[in-house]
UniProtKB/Swiss-Prot annotation:
It comes from the Archaea. It is found in: Cytoplasm. One of its GO terms (cellular component) is cytoplasm. It holds the Pfam family PTS_EIIA_2. This is PTS system fructose-specific EIIA component. The active site is at residue 70. The PTS EIIA type-2 domain is phosphorylated by phospho-HPr on a histidyl residue. Then, it transfers the phosphoryl group to the PTS EIIB type-2 domain. The modification Phosphohistidine is found at residue 70. Signal peptide: none annotated. PROSITE patterns: PTS_EIIA_TYPE_2. PANTHER family: PTS SYSTEM FRUCTOSE-LIKE EIIA COMPONENT-RELATED. GO terms for molecular function: kinase activity; protein-N(PI)-phosphohistidine-sugar phosphotransferase activity.
Amino acid sequence: MDVTDISTITPLELISLEEPPATKEGAIEFLLDLAVDAGRVDDRDAALDALLEREGEATTGVGFGIGIPHAKTDAVSKPTVAFARSAEGIDFDAMDDKPAKLLFMILVPAAGGEDHLQILSALSRSLMHEDVREKLLEAESKQTVQDVLAEVVE
């Protein structure tokens, strides 16, 4: 699968411009439910367990106001990335102690190890650029968010 095809891994229904819950676990469940509602997750409980287990191993608060909870799980059959943002920011235990305002949840099938790493590294690289983060924070539509991601994830 071409993991750089944003419209496939992050269709519009996986993008939320609503304020997510203010806790890390609440925000993770909010992102997961976007994927569940879009029919991308076969087993919500298994996906949530995988995300929280991964979160327990090491923080997914990567700094710069970004949180990227992620997991490999058989609860999904294709790579899935959900997006939400928080005006206030959510404590994701980032190394720079900054709250996460941009949230990306990555779920890939257990056998899709390469996809997982490709998506994570492409997102991480693009989000290091302040102008990209600003565009995502200021986007007024789901389509704009998707367009920004499509532009920067190669």
